[in-house]
A protein has these predicted regions:
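An N-terminal-biased, well-structured beta-alpha scaffold segment characteristic
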Residues: 2-106, 110
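Adenosine-phosphate binding glycine-rich loop
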Residues: 118-159, 269, 274-371
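Residue-level detector of alpha-helix initiation sites
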Residues: 76, 136, 177-178
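Glycine-rich phosphate/diphosphate-binding loop of Rossmann-like nucleotide-binding domains
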Residues: 6-45, 152-240, 287
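Rossmann-like adenosine-cofactor binding region
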Residues: 209-291
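Short glycine-/small-residue-rich Rossmann-like dinucleotide-binding loops
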Residues: 69, 75-76, 95-96, 221, ...
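Glycine/serine-rich phosphate-binding loop and adjoining beta1-alpha1 elements at the start
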Residues: 2, 8, 79-169, 298-300
């Protein structure tokens, strides 16, 4: 199969969809891998490393896309990339379509087959291709939040762990999944006072057992969120409804109850954000202030630590990439019921129910396309 790895073009996105090690695996199975020149440089992978792995280098971006049967990316395609997609091609990347109607319709118009990393499941009901980047984003959320609390960044001038004689900052994490646990773990490690809110009692029990009561666990209700809003210096939004838009859990009215200079970090921004006042930002201009509250809403947080993120991503995606390359998308998805939910768009039709519901579109059962 002809496999293409274009260079990411989203603002400050330095990750690449495939490491040289991954390219070597695919070439060894008889596939042709074409990597856009410079695609791996931001993650510390030189062109020469891809050549040594047997991949072809191509400087012309148009040629990278034109001859591809399978296109591997990291972030959702930007407008100029959507324009390059065509029927007969398979795109495998993070899509987060439920918050992006223009992108969804663009992919439909392309006629391509679009498979999303973030909606593939596993036997335990987890999201195996979202988990590694969620781990990175959760840990980075606390770094970003701690920095945003500095006075020069618009924050209250609070040091997360405090100092002897001065209380540490209070941190609330809304959502106790992979992002939430990693955010809470980082905040705890830095010495903050940490509360995790979640609607799953079994999940809260797991966190209680794992951290031996060193962080507070609270069943998430409107009242519990109100209390966090009033008391906390830093709130991390880590809520996920797989494939669907995130719920708005903190309204603009609630910002008035927060301490001036407090910080909101919205890790759910890829899915539209879980704060009413959230809007996507970039690594170039990561924060803004609404009603005295600092908002950090960078949509590709792991892109800032591209080498770690790229290695973790390839470790997770490579088995699925191999299946697509060896079998073609239909057989690969037919053989694996956990791979099947990854199909979001095919031949002009939406195949993931939550995306269809978000925009009032009809959804096609993906199982009907792979029989």
């Amino acid at each position: 199969m002809q496999i293409a790895v274009p260079k990411e073009i989203k603002n400050h996105e330095y990750r690449v969809a495939l490491t040289p090690t991954g390219a070597r695996e695919l070439v060894g199975r008889g596939h042709t891998v074409t990597v856009q020149a410079g695609a791996g440089e931001g993650a510390g992978f030189a062109d020469a490393a891809y050549e040594a792995a047997g991949a072809r280098l191509e400087a012309d971006v148009a040629r990278v896309w034109e001859g591809a049967e399978l296109i591997l990316k990291v972030k959702e395609p930007q407008a100029e990339e959507v324009a390059r997609l065509k029927a007969g091609q398979t795109l495998f990347t993070y899509l987060h379509l439920a918050a992006e109607e223009t992108l969804t319709r663009g992919l439909m118009e392309s006629g391509a087959t679009c498979i999303a990393y973030e909606t593939i499941t596993d036997r335990q009901g987890g999201l195996p291709l979202l988990a590694p980047m969620s781990t990175v984003a959760g840990r980075m959320a606390i770094q970003a939040g701690a920095h945003s609390l500095e006075k020069a960044q618009g924050g209250a001038g609070v040091l997360l762990p405090g100092v002897p004689g001065v209380a540490p900052a209070k941190v609330a994490v809304i959502g106790g999944g992979v992002v939430g646990e990693n955010a809470a773990r980082m905040a705890l490690g830095l010495g903050a006072e940490v509360t995790v809110l979640d609607k799953s009692i079994p999940r809260l029990e797991t966190l209680d057992d794992r951290y031996q009561g060193r962080m507070k666990t609270v069943f998430s209700t409107a009242d519990a969120i109100d209390e966090a809003v009033r008391e906390c210096d830093l709130i991390v939004g880590a809520v996920l409804i797989p494939g669907a838009a995130a719920p708005k859990l903190i309204t603009r009215e609630m910002l008035a109850e927060m301490k001036p200079g407090s910080v909101l970090v919205d890790v759910a921004i890829d899915q539209g954000g879980c704060f009413e006042t959230s809007r996507a930002t970039t690594h170039t201009d990561p924060t803004y202030i609404v009603d005295g509250i600092v908002h950090y809403c960078v949509a590709n947080m792991p892109g800032a630590v591209a080498r770690t993120s790229t290695q973790a991503l390839t470790n997770a995606t490579l088995p699925f990439v191999i299946a697509l390359a060896d079998k073609g998308w239909q057989q690969a998805l037919a053989d694996d019921p956990h791979f099947l939910p990854g199909l979001n768009v095919h031949d002009g039709r939406v195949t993931y129910q939550a995306v269809a519901d978000a925009f009032g579109l009809e959804s096609v059962d993906p199982a009907s396309l792979v029989k």
